[in-house]
Curated annotation (Swiss-Prot):
Record protein name field: Complement component C6
Domain Sushi: 642-701, 702-763
Protein species of origin: Mus musculus
Family note: Belongs to the complement C6/C7/C8/C9 family.
UniProt keyword terms in alphabetical order: Calcium, Complement pathway, Cytolysis, Disulfide bond, EGF-like domain, Glycoprotein, Immunity, Innate immunity, Membrane, Membrane attack complex, Metal-binding, Repeat, Secreted, Signal, Sushi, Target cell membrane, Target membrane, Transmembrane, Transmembrane beta strand
GO biological process, one term: complement activation, classical pathway
SMART domains referenced in this protein's UniProt entry, alphabetically: CCP (SM00032), FIMAC (SM00057), LDLa (SM00192), MACPF (SM00457), TSP1 (SM00209)
Encoding gene, per UniProt annotation: C6
Length: 934
């Protein structure tokens, strides 16, 4: 066989040698065909316009010429539009702000250039409070009660200082006892040390500590530059103005991509102890108050700049410190505004209300740090130009540092670096290595914003002037920032207020839910192994080295990897609390899963934590104060000389007055948790041999507790406990459906079918293609054709109540089957209402409406429905909305003689008025078509 192939090849070469070589361009190409996809990498092709003649055969053009070519097109990823859920209920009225709030959640952030969400996530309205705006504190017996409600030590009364904040401690004072011999100025910018810090956004928020409070102590600190000492706040453990700034501590780092930059920046943001104490979430995230989110918005600029070109980055930074400070570990004085916000938190958990604490005051507070500034620039370079320069990564860093010093930003002595002026990149830009960068972006902290922004520059400009750095340095003294800090959770400050333990636990729960809103697990995977980052309601892609583009969809010539690293999906909801008072949640490495040799996700796929379970039906949150919180582990273990230890209990059981040790002969009663009842003999007795008498008792289920589901799902009916045989329905916002069964029944063992912790909403099959084809249709090639109710409607879509005109029966159908049937000209099926068919006023009016619609002169399609004479179609909800009777026209088409209301007097109305009156649930009796007799 091989011999024959060799002979054929030799003959072909001989023939080509004897003939003229085919000039393939003699046959022109057609235009490229249209792309097979509008996004997500389609293909297009073209063909040669071949003319088969003697030249074609003589010169073997059929063998030598490529007749068809294909290429990729529309590489950009399909846009994903932002989707918001509905607003929740209004919160209770805040007595201090006289406002109430409601919020909506982001069901899906925008990505890949999709439409952003423009509606506000939070809305307020004025209200009339039922409480006074006062501070209530516990244990105020031996203290002075301020008019505001705050308690202060009695020794602070009449000392000439406003310790209450409202000066009520200085009224009606015959004599004052000054604390200090004269008035001293507080430490400059001391209030900055008391601000909260939003860890997720990387920025300061509202004041949580009252650092103007001195606590009746005249503690002073002096700086070497000032002749007069400063008064120290009672919240401060230590203040030190003797800060040495090392002139030559300018640092640089090289980053091949922003993924490694972000990871390094996050690890630098917290101390080691704090990182293990708090959740590991990046600080570069969107803040709702984005007008103050300088650091977050600046990093987003860096990300978007990296999309323009395959880039590498060099960061240069330096700390400037004015003073160091350390807060006291306990007995911190809270600011009035923060204390009032804590006091007026509701006892019952409300995610929206508790989350406002983090929006207004941040998630952490400063335990130590420095006042000053941070010179911090990141330079973007073309990766290709940097490689062609001939410099190593270390040499490139040295050149950035050398030229920064040379330009007299920092007025340091420098050593001449020939490699920085005589490399290919610098020579291309007149001997300047920095001029060869694409741009620099300011991540500067402290100082006036105008001077901080002037430190950065764009390619093609002359760059910052020599005096810019010195001007910024001077402005740092007037406008310092907290730098080089350590943090503690803001929940640690919730002390010495009514129900402190309850509110502290609620805040910790809210913080977990709040942090989940910043988790990029909600984003779709980015092309070419990019890492998604959630910025408000938009997902951005951070590109790997060698890739770029708006969504990292473009590759540099040297990028050959097809590996896809795994990324975590979102955490499931927490499981119910088990008998060991533990609950758990899981996540999967599927966003995306590792492919083609990619790395798996780092970290654990399961979490566990302590939890509490109510042994009785929950009738409200208990108020637990700090001094009431005592755990069994704090109690001394008794000496077990005689008697019985705790008895073994059946599942879902407990005992009243539980003890560590029971006397011989003592009995205990077995009780069951809410939703269970005891079957058998419920009493156990401690025997002389220190064992328990065997009792045949078990806890059998009599009801089911409300299941724990994700926030996006709505449970109907909403109850705390459901009896065996009762059912619930799970629903989603409009345009979304439950990604699984929507109806569940309480059975003897549990909910049937089992309710998954990861159950959520997904886009309805009808909504997915609505931009391409009308509802009930699907795309086939370039055309839209009707869906098949049997073949195309297997995926879940919302339930509708439908009336079949042929059989005069109503039934529940999926929206997909209903719309597919309408497309196939099934005129017998009519929409009654959304949701399953259930007896009641909604079903009665829906059926009566269809009877009345037979004579309607108006038929306007509106979502699933058709609007008639007495209705208008709402463009916002795609529902038919009834007119008010006065809004109906006075035409005399389709008249009816009716009796309306309790008076039941006869009246002639048209079909619009009749429908509007019935829609308003007003009693109407139709006497006959046409006018009433005179």
């Amino acid at each position: 066989m091989t011999r024959h192939l060799t002979l054929c090849f030799i003959l072909l070469v001989m023939l080509i040698d004897k003939s003229e070589a085919c000039f393939c361009d003699h046959y022109p190409w057609t235009h490229w065909s249209s792309c097979s996809k509008s996004c997500n990498s389609g293909t297009q092709s073209r063909q040669r316009q071949v003319v088969v003649n003697d030249y074609y055969w003589k010169n073997l053009c059929d063998k030598l010429c490529i007749k068809q070519e294909t290429r990729e097109c529309n590489l950009q990823t399909c846009p994903i539009n932002c989707v918001l859920g509905d607003y929740g209920t209004w919160s209770d009225c805040d007595p201090c702000t006289e406002k109430q709030v409601k919020v909506k959640s982001v069901l899906r952030p925008s990505q890949f250039g999709g439409q952003p969400c423009t509606e506000p996530l939070v809305t307020f309205q004025p209200c009339v409070p039922s409480k006074l705006c006062k501070i209530e504190e516990t244990n105020c017996k031996n203290k002075f009660l301020c008019d505001s409600g705050r308690c202060i030590p009695s020794k602070l009364e009449c000392n000439g200082e406003n310790d209450c904040g409202d000066n009520s401690d200085e009224r009606n004072c015959g004599r004052t006892k000054p604390v200090c011999t004269r008035i001293y100025t507080p430490i400059p910018s001391v209030q900055l040390m008391g601000t909260g810090f939003h860890f997720l956004a990387g920025e300061p928020r509202g004041e949580v500590l009252d650092n103007s409070f001195t606590g009746g102590i005249c503690k002073l600190v002096k700086t070497s530059r000032a002749s007069n000492p400063y008064r120290v706040s009672a919240n401060l453990e230590n203040v030190n103005f003797e800060v040495q700034t090392i002139e030559d501590d300018l640092k640089t780092e090289f980053y091949k991509n922003l993924i490694s930059f972000e990871k390094n920046k996050n690890e630098d943001s917290l101390s080691v102890d704090e990182r293990t104490k708090f959740f590991p979430i990046p600080i570069f995230h969107f803040s709702e108050k984005n007008e103050h989110s300088h650091y977050s918005s600046a990093f987003n600029k860096v990300i978007k700049a990296s999309h323009k070109k395959d880039s590498s980055f060099i960061r240069i930074h330096k700390l400037i410190k004015v003073l160091n400070f350390t807060m006291k570990a306990t007995d911190l004085q809270l600011s009035d505004v923060f204390l009032k916000a804590l006091v007026h938190l509701p006892l019952e958990y409300n995610s929206a209300v508790y989350s406002r604490i983090f929006d207004d005051f941040g998630t952490h507070y400063f335990t130590s740090g420095s006042l000053g500034g941070k010179y911090d620039l990141i330079y973007q370079f073309s990766r290709q130009e940097l490689q062609n320069s001939g410099l190593t990564e270390e040499e490139a860093q040295n050149c950035v540092q050398y030229e920064t010093k040379k330009l007299k930003f920092l007025y340091m002595e420098i050593h001449k670096e020939d490699t920085c002026t005589k490399n290919k990149l610098s020579e291309k830009y007149g001997g300047s290595f920095l001029q060869g960068s694409e741009k620099s972006i300011s991540l500067v902290q402290g100082g006036r914003s105008q001077q901080a922004a002037a430190l950065a520059w764009e390619k093609g400009t002359s760059g910052p002037e020599e005096n810019v750095y010195s001007e910024w340095l001077e402005s740092v003294k007037e406008n310092p920032a907290v730098v080089d800090y350590k943090l503690a959770p803001i929940t640690d400050l919730v002390r010495n207020i009514p129900c402190a333990v309850t509110k502290r636990n609620n805040l910790r729960r809210a913080l977990q839910e709040y942090a989940a809103k910043f988790d990029p697990c909600q984003c779709a995977p980015c092309p070419n192994n990019g890492r998604p980052r959630l910025s408000g309601t938009e997902c951005l892609c951070v590109c790997q080295s060698g890739t770029y583009g708006e969504n990292c969809e473009r590759r540099s010539p040297g990028y050959k990897s097809d590996a896809v690293d795994g990324n975590w999906g979102c955490w499931s909801s927490w499981s119910a609390c088990n008998a060991a008072y533990r609950r758990s949640r899981t996540r999967e490495c599927n966003n995306p899963a590792p492919q083609r040799g990619g790395q798996s996700c780092g970290g654990k796929d399961q979490q566990e934590e302590d939890c509490t379970v109510s042994i009785m039906e929950n009738v409200g949150q208990p108020c637990i104060n700090d001094d009431e919180e005592m755990k069994e582990v704090d109690l001394a273990e008794p000496e077990a000389e005689s008697g019985c230890s705790q008895p073994p209990l059946p599942e879902n059981a407990f005992t009243w007055n539980e003890k560590k040790l029971y006397s011989v002969g003592e009995e205990v009663e077995i009780s069951c948790l809410t939703g269970f009842t005891a079957v058998g003999f419920q009493y156990l007795r401690c025997l002389p041999d220190r064992t328990w008498s065997q009792g045949d008792v078990e806890c059998q289920r009599t009801s089911c507790l409300k299941p724990v589901v994700q926030d996006v799902l709505t449970i109907s009916p909403f109850q705390r406990v459901y009896q065996i045989g009762e059912s619930i329905e799970l629903t989603c916002p409009r345009g979304f459906v439950v990604a699984g069964p929507s109806r569940y029944t309480c059975k003897e063992d549990s909910w049937t079918p089992p309710i998954s912790n990861s159950l959520t909403c997904e886009q309805a099959i009808l909504t997915k293609s609505k931009d391409l084809c009308p509802p009930g249709q699907k795309q086939s090639g370039s055309k839209c054709i009707c869906m098949s109710p049997e073949e195309d409607c297997s995926a879940y879509s919302e339930d509708l109540c439908i009336f079949d005109g042929g059989s005069s029966q109503y039934f529940t159908s999926s929206a997909c089957k209903f719309l597919a049937g309408k497309c196939l000209n099934n005129t017998q099926s009519h929409f009654v209402h959304s949701g399953s068919c259930q007896e009641g006023l909604q079903l009665e009016w829906g059926l009566e409406r269809l009877k009345l619609a037979v004579n309607s002169t108006k038929r306007v399609s509106c979502g699933y429905n058709t609007c008639y004479d007495w209705e208008n179609c709402s463009a916002h909800t795609s529902n038919c909305v009834c007119l008010l009777p006065p809004q109906c026209s006075k035409d005399e088409n389709q008249l009816y003689c009716v009796k309306i209301g309790s008076s039941m007097r006869e009246k002639t109305v048209n079909i619009c008025t009749l429908g509007a009156v019935r829609c308003a649930n007003i009693k109407v009796e139709i006497l006959n078509p046409g006018r009433c007799p005179d």
